[in-house]
């Protein structure tokens, strides 16, 4: 069974990242590698996590012309990762190209999910980039586009999970960042929820980074989260 908890490796060096990884169990959590760590350490670091039998979510949010995104997704799959993502705003053709690029992997292909609206966005910011929809409307619209393209699910704030499930089906995966513990500040995330709230909303996977990586004892935080989930 795939764990619901995805620990975001929000570190700027390999030593600190691996110190945390060594305390984690691949049966209890997956790991997320984002742009900072991937740019710093590259594919070999991802392969090392896979070698340690962790499910790896490669969070690089590909967004480019369809052919480029297709090749990037194929290259990511070559690393043996469990999940990759693209920006839904890239459009239907880009999403379809990403999906098609993974067909050769058959049942062993990674999950392909689309980013809807970043959880750092606030309501007024959509208008500043020319989008007139509300946040829930835009997230739902992009989720339905991803569903049409044949993707497995989306990255979305927990605030939009219920409506996305209603529109796209219960089996459409929702991966939820912006998860904060009750005693944590929101920092640069605007639309946040606690783990328990997000699970009640229907989130399938919870991405948790700084509440774990910046904790005085991150291992205790992980253990407490696993008990709660």
From Swiss-Prot:
CDD domains: OMP_decarboxylase_like. Keywords: Decarboxylase, Lyase, Pyrimidine biosynthesis. The active site is at residue 61. One of its GO terms (molecular function) is orotidine-5'-phosphate decarboxylase activity. GO terms for biological process: 'de novo' pyrimidine nucleobase biosynthetic process; 'de novo' UMP biosynthetic process. It holds the Pfam family OMPdecase. It catalyses: orotidine 5'-phosphate + H(+) = UMP + CO2. GO terms for cellular component: cytosol. SUPFAM superfamilies: Ribulose-phoshate binding barrel (SSF51366). Pathway: Pyrimidine metabolism; UMP biosynthesis via de novo pathway; UMP from orotate: step 2/2. The keyword Lyase applies. The keyword Lyase applies. InterPro entries: Aldolase_TIM, OMPdecase, OMPdecase_AS, OMPdecase_bac, OMPdeCOase_dom, RibuloseP-bd_barrel. Its EC number is 4.1.1.23. Catalyzes the decarboxylation of orotidine 5'-monophosphate (OMP) to uridine 5'-monophosphate (UMP). Belongs to the OMP decarboxylase family. Type 1 subfamily. Homodimer. This is Orotidine 5'-phosphate decarboxylase. It comes from Legionella pneumophila (strain Lens).
